[in-house]
């Protein structure tokens, strides 16, 4: 075995699972990540005269470069000229400087230990490109000089977290909903089906609803004080006096935080295809916005998530050919070899934060059982706890990196030095 033995339990391998919405990181062998903070980060570019803003809790980039504000607390402070950006696009790293800032921050503030002491297992999108994988490998070995590295596809890790090596992973996160077939721990690339209808899409739908209802979205950072008002009456709040000139992207990010809270508290998927009459009978949910305005939401709380299952229902997308969630699953299975289909239908694993909308799995189960051929046994695997569903690929990574049998799988520093960054293609399927 090359490059020295790494005993998974003793070394304390680190597991990074960087998604489009949050970053999850922590030690292998633990049952949940140590940190979970937004992937969106604040960036203040340099002023013309070369001076930046006051340095308090920012992470300075390269000399004279931008200042990054990472983690919930630093990001949510209003600052002049701070843009909110995300290093990822389509689940893959796009902006390497800000991606590196996230890693630096995690090592400095949360791991609080030398990067060179811990092997790293990192999750990646199943469609990650070869060039990006090699660049990431190079970054980890050259810049952080870690002792060993491994890249694993998110879907495979999710399957492992649920004790399976074969199954169909339905992952609905922030930017996309995907069905990914996994067989014996390998992703079947030809069967991947993606749809852009996911968490961010629901956020957009909520935004449109608020515009129709004339509800003004006021993020908490603007509010100095507010008074309790009767249901449905106009809000009575005072604006903060000295607010800096914030950028549009950052203000948007703060508004989205409010909407995401609304999404989690109010929305529900209807049990069967959306029907005005049935929806009107459903109990309403009371919600209060940060500025004190409050009202009840009835049918609309079922109408918004309906777009996930029945895209023809969504206004503004008429004539679209997008697939609903259950179609994504059946299409994906249909693209796989006929012999392995029973194994896929037999463990459809639901993961991702967007699937936590109330009754999501019930509706999916119902639709799939109507679409599954009678010869197949359908089994839907969905953890009930938020943690396991949001962190499923991190948990899978934690299990994998601490297995004794996995220890010969690492790309060791020695192998990297001998074989270069190409070894990631060979060692990490």
From Swiss-Prot:
Residues bearing the modification N-acetylserine: 2
Entry comment describing in which tissues the protein is expressed: Widely expressed. Expressed selectively in neural stem and progenitor cells (at protein level).
Phosphoserine, modified sites: 86, 233
Q: Which residues form the signal peptide?
A: none
* GO annotation, cellular component aspect: brahma complex; chromatin; GBAF complex; Ino80 complex; kinetochore; npBAF complex; NuA4 histone acetyltransferase complex; nuclear matrix
- Superkingdom in the source lineage: Eukaryota
Assembly information from the UniProt record: Component of numerous complexes with chromatin remodeling and histone acetyltransferase activity. Component of the NuA4 histone acetyltransferase complex which contains the catalytic subunit KAT5/TIP60 and the subunits EP400, TRRAP/PAF400, BRD8/SMAP, EPC1, DMAP1/DNMAP1, RUVBL1/TIP49, RUVBL2, ING3, actin, ACTL6A/BAF53A, MORF4L1/MRG15, MORF4L2/MRGX, MRGBP, YEATS4/GAS41, VPS72/YL1 and MEAF6. The NuA4 complex interacts with MYC and the adenovirus E1A protein.
For this chain, the family text in UniProt reads:
Belongs to the actin family.
Q: What does this protein do?
A: Involved in transcriptional activation and repression of select genes by chromatin remodeling (alteration of DNA-nucleosome topology). Component of SWI/SNF chromatin remodeling complexes that carry out key enzymatic activities, changing chromatin structure by altering DNA-histone contacts within a nucleosome in an ATP-dependent manner. Required for maximal ATPase activity of SMARCA4/BRG1/BAF190A and for association of the SMARCA4/BRG1/BAF190A containing remodeling complex BAF with chromatin/nuclear matrix.
What protein am I looking at? Answer: Actin-like protein 6A
Species whose genome carries this gene: Mus musculus (Mouse)
Name of the gene this protein is made from: Actl6a
């Amino acid at each position: 075995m090359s490059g020295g033995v790494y005993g998974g339990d003793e070394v304390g391998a680190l597991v990074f699972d960087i998604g489009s919405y949050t970053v999850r990181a922590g030690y292998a062998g633990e049952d949940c990540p140590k940190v979970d903070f937004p992937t969106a980060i604040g960036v203040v570019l340099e002023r013309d005269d070369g001076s930046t803003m006051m340095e308090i809790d920012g992470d300075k980039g390269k000399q004279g470069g931008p200042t990054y504000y990472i983690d919930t607390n630093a990001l949510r402070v209003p600052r002049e000229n701070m843009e909110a950006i995300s290093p990822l696009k389509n689940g893959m790293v796009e902006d390497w400087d800000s991606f590196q800032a996230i890693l630096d921050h995690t090592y400095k503030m949360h791991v609080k230990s030398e990067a060179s002491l811990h092997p790293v297992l990192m999750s990646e999108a199943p469609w990650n490109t070869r060039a990006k994988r090699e660049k990431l490998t190079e970054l980890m070995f050259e810049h952080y000089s870690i002792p060993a590295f491994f890249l694993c596809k998110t879907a495979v890790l999710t399957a492992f977290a649920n004790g399976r090596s074969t199954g169909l992973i339905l992952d609905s996160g922030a930017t996309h909903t995907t069905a990914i077939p996994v067989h014996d721990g390998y992703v079947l690339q030809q069967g991947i089906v993606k749809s852009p209808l996911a968490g961010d899409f629901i956020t957009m739908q909520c935004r449109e609803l608020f515009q129709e209802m004339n509800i003004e979205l006021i993020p908490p950072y603007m509010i100095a004080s507010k008074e309790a008002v009767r249901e449905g009456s106009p809000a009575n709040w005072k604006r903060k006096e000295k607010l800096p000139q914030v950028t549009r992207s950052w203000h948007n990010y703060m508004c989205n935080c409010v909407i995401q809270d609304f999404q989690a508290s109010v929305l529900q998927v209807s049990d069967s295809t959306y029907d005005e009459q049935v929806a009107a009978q459903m109990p309403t949910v009371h919600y209060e916005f940060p500025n004190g305005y409050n009202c009840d939401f009835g049918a609309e709380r079922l109408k918004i998530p309906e777009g996930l299952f029945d895209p023809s229902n969504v206004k503004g997308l008429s004539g679209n050919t997008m697939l609903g969630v259950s179609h994504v699953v059946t299409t994906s299975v249909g693209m796989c070899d006929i012999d392995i289909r029973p194994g896929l239908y037999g463990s459809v694993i639901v993961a991702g934060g967007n699937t936590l909308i109330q009754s999501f799995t019930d509706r999916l189960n119902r639709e799939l059982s109507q679409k599954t051929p009678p010869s197949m046994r359908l089994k839907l695997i969905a953890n009930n706890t938020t943690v396991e569903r949001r962190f499923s690929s991190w948990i899978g990574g934690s299990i994998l990196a601490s297995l004794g049998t996995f220890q010969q799988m690492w790309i060791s520093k020695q192998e990297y030095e001998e074989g270069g960054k190409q070894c990631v293609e060979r060692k990490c399927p």
